[in-house]
Amino acid sequence: YYENSIVVPGPETELLAKAAKDAGAWLSIGVSERDALTATLYNTNLFFSPEGEIIVHRKLKPTGSERVVWGDADKNYFPVAETPWGPMGSMICWESYMPLARAALYQKGITLYISPNTNDNDEWQSTIKHIAIEGHCYFINCDMYFTRDTYPADLQAQDEIAKLPEKVCRGGSCIVDPYGHYLTEPVWDKEAVIYAELDMSKVAASRMEFDVCGHYARPDVLKLVVEDK
């Protein structure tokens, strides 16, 4: 993991920033990040703007055995990118199961919720629909498709790899609108590029009924405090 983790910013991010600039597009990608001064690694999602600006989100709390590899996020919690379509933020995998972490993004007015993850099950599909409705935002579900043959042949522990199912992670990438409806159905058991046109007026329309951090909130009763650094 250490040898394949990248320093941010670094040569790899320069290439990605150039790609975003050349395409005139926003880019979101997950990486294993290495601190430039220490040996600590982070499970990280990066945003690149069309101007090449980098926005870094480190996973707040690694899940289960991930803690053997990655550390806790230590700064700049819950960053959002200001896009022409509203604030865009990300939660990595099971971060989305943390209600207060979701609320921290909702408080920033997030309209585009990006989630890189490896949750290839029906329960996760229920979760992302709930979040799209709860935050009245578009949920971009980026789910890994990964087979046993994807592992490099020279990787150690081949005996353990041989015991894995042929399809280690079945995918399930999809896009959900602010009402919890699929704009693109989950893609299972294959690689694919998914895309959709997003009607951003749905965000405002849906929030007229339920605005989780606005008119449907009770800040005099319930309050979230984020100890950011």
Regions found by a protein language model. Name each.
Residues 133-140, 146-147:
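Acidic, glycine-rich loop-and-strand cores that form catalytic or ligand-binding grooves
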Residues 92, 117, 141-144, 197:
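Active-site proximal loops enriched in glycine and acidic residues that flank catalytic Cys/His/Asp
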Residues 1-14, 161-168:
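A short acidic, glycine-rich active-site loop
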